[in-house]
Amino acid sequence: MCTVCGCGGHSVEDQFKAHLKSQGKDGAHKPAPFAVLAEPQGPHSHSHSHWHTHADGTSHAHPHAHSHSHAAGHGAEADSDHPHAHGHDHGHSHGACAHDIHLGHGPAGTEVPGMSQARLIEIETDILSKNNQYAARNRAALAKNCTFATNLVSSPGSGKTTLLVKTIEMLGAQPLAVIEGDQQTTNDADRIRATGAPAIQVNTGKGCHLDGAMVEQALAHLPLPAGALLFIENVGNLVCPAAFDLGEDAKVAILSVTEGEDKPLKYPDMFAAAGLAILNKVDLAPYCDVDLDLYEANIRRVNPQIEVLRVSARTGDGMGAWIDWLRAGLARKAR
């Protein structure tokens, strides 16, 4: 997560209020303004672990924390104004910069000017503890309803929404609902609603991820029959969402074959937190000069226990295994 992520107040679109407002007295449809429930939030912080991979291939994790305010956006980038020590030798070349900058070696996993590592860890503990309270309430409510919830996380453009649309089509009469997270617009929620499935859009504004409180608010306005599947499509971001429990049963990390085989090593936190990785757009592999086996190997370097599925949401290849995984998860919740 960035040192100053600029998370702002979020809004949850209530599709039913929006629908009612879209109709005039004569019953004719008119363009509907967004009906939103706004919840401005005060100062807070985020945290999670960061992985660091050395040139010799060894990897290890660091905790990470930072604080910021929800009251306003931030326009400045974080920078470091102090020297940084390294415990290993560097070669020197006069033709190029010989020293990389690593800000994650301290106990807190990051550096913020004017703030000690101890204070960063204190903030980390506080914000995650509060989020976990919301997540626990969500988890209890979903368990009571025998709902299997997945938190879909990825970079922007990995194909999450296309995968969801295909999934909904293949599930047929299976009860389900979707929470869509984006900074702005209802584009993805509109695509989901076009399939006939209920969906709520959560616009996070300056926020770079969903959190437990946002999901709790969305659930209050989403019809969710007993025994349903719940899909939470998080904001496109491979860093920040890794730290935040939403009350889901599993995080599902989605990776497009166009993103590069080393993506799991460069952004390991999410793959370490996920129970399933979906390697999407495999139909493009022959045109991208990529090694699918290397993708899987790098994912498992970060998380040896993770399950990996190769899927093309466009052609349907591999989708059967994904549907089976969802139904197995739902069956476990019903026991």
UniProtKB/Swiss-Prot annotation:
UniProt KW Metal-binding keyword: yes
Gene: hypB
Keywords from the named record: GTP-binding, Hydrolase, Metal-binding, Nickel, Nucleotide-binding, Zinc
Positions of Ni(2+) 2 binding: 208-209, 240
Role this protein plays: Involved in the maturation of [NiFe] hydrogenases. Required for nickel insertion into the metal center of the hydrogenase. Exhibits a low intrinsic GTPase activity, which is essential for nickel insertion.
Biased composition regions of type Basic residues, renumbered to the chain: 61-71
GO biological process, one term: protein maturation
Family in the record: Belongs to the SIMIBI class G3E GTPase family. HypB/HupM subfamily.
One Gene Ontology MF term: nickel cation binding
Positions of Zn(2+) binding: 208-209, 240
UniProt binding sites for Ni(2+) 1: 2, 5, 7
Region described as G-domain: 149-309
Protein known as: Hydrogenase maturation factor HypB
Region (Disordered): 36-112
Basic and acidic residues bias (residue ranges): 76-103
Matching Gene3D superfamilies: P-loop containing nucleotide triphosphate hydrolases (3.40.50.300)
Species this chain originates from: Rhodobacter capsulatus
